Each structure stands twice: as C-alpha cells, then as structure tokens.
C-alpha cells in the first residue's frame, strides 16, 4: 500500500502539470477535429519572425543530442539511477515512436504540400527538411519524456524534503512544474513551426512522451531507482 500511496501522492502533487497538459491536449484535439490537416498547419504556422526562426531552429535541436548530455549530469553526484530513469524513459518512448512511425509511413509536410501548389509551405532557412515517417513526432516525444521525468523527480524530492510544505511552497512548486510543461510544449510546437511535422504528429508524440516516464517510474521505482527514503 505504501508503494501505491506514494505513486498517488506524486501524481497528486503534479496535478497542475497533468491537468494543464490535458487541457492543452483537449484544445489541440478539438482543433484536429475542426480543421483539415493542411489548413490547420497553415493556421498554426502563419506568423514567422527572424527571432522565432532562430529560436525554434536551435531549440528543436535540444531533443537530439543535448538532451542526452543533460541526462548524464546526475552521474556527477553519483546518482546513476536518475540517469537510468531518464535513459529507460527515452528509450522506451523512442521504441514506441519508431514502431508507430513504421506502421504508418506518413509523409512529412514538405511532401504533402507538393499536392497544394497554390500554398506556400512556411520554411526556416538552414533547416534540413525530412520527407517521411512523420507520424508521430519523435522530437516531441523526447521533449515530453525529458521534462516529465524532471517533473516526476521534482515532485518526489518535494514530497521527501525536510522543508515545511504549505500552500505557498505548493504554489511555487506548481509554477515550476508549469515551466517544465511550457518547455516541453515549446519543443513540440517547434516541430510544427519548422514544418517538420503536422499538428497530429506532435499531439501523439506528446502523449507518448507524457505517458512513458510515469510507466517507467511505476515499474522501476523500487528496483532500479531505489528512491525510497
């Protein structure tokens, strides 16, 4: 019962993170229901600026190799179990993404827009465009896996800290968790902004990325992570 109760406490502590994600997901699902794929892509990707081009171009790269370097940081403090948690979450999420990608073989926006010669696909200079396996977005999954892992570990430490927990500390914690969610969501949106993915690709990628850390944490908390106080 202690194990199940602890998981419930962690999820309850991250209720703001989870609820806001579900609200965002519901809004995006509503957009997917209301607009055709190409029309929604143009709607989501209609305002480009030089600053945004540079920001999303480089921020999107974080989900490639930098995220894995950051996940190695706990090794400095000899907390290899935290790196194992990040690694198992990213690997499991990546496996799910690759299985789905190769089941659907969905074309990327640059290929789909060839069928719409009257529409100009928004592109960012210097970004190498990909053409296949669009669904779901692997980068988005990576972003959400990483920041959800951070949120789960932050919640665990919050629950087991010696500092007094009250409404004020909970509000500060919840705001911190929303910053993590915003960083994940920005990563997902960057894939739409760069026209590497459609909104549906990003939506499903976020679902995979949000879910896998919870599953891995549930399965490995006692055996691998050894986070019992």
State the predicted function of each range.
Residues 2-68, 101-130:
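N-terminal transmembrane-helix/juxtamembrane module of multi-pass inner/ER membrane proteins
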Residues 94-98, 102, 210-217:
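Transmembrane alpha-helical segments of multi-pass membrane transport proteins and ion-pumping complexes
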Residues 122-229:
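Membrane-embedded catalytic cores of phosphoryl/pyrophosphoryl-handling enzymes
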């Amino acid at each position: 019962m202690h194990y199940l109760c602890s998981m419930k406490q962690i999820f309850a502590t991250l209720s703001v993170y989870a609820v806001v994600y579900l609200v965002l997901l519901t809004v995006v699902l509503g957009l997917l229901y209301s607009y055709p794929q190409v029309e929604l892509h143009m709607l989501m990707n209609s305002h480009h600026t030089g600053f945004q081009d540079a920001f999303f171009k480089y921020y999107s790269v974080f989900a490639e190799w930098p995220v894995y370097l950051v996940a190695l940081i706990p090794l400095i403090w000899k907390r290899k179990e935290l790196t194992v948690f990040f690694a198992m979450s990213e690997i499991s999420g990546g496996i799910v993404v690759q299985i789905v990608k190769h089941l659907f073989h969905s074309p990327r926006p640059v290929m789909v827009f060839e069928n719409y010669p009257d529409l100009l696909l928004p592109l960012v200079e210097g970004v190498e465009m990909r053409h296949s396996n669009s669904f779901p977005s692997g980068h988005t999954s990576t972003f959400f896996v990483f920041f959800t892992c951070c949120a789960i570990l932050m919640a665990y430490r919050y629950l087991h800290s010696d500092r007094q927990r009250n409404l004020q500390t909970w509000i500060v914690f919840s705001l911190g968790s929303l910053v993590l969610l915003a960083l994940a969501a920005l990563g997902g949106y960057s894939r739409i902004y760069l026209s590497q993915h459609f909104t549906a690709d990003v939506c499903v990628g976020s679902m995979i990325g949000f879910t896998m850390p919870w599953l891995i944490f549930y399965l490995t908390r006692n055996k691998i992570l050894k986070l019992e106080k």
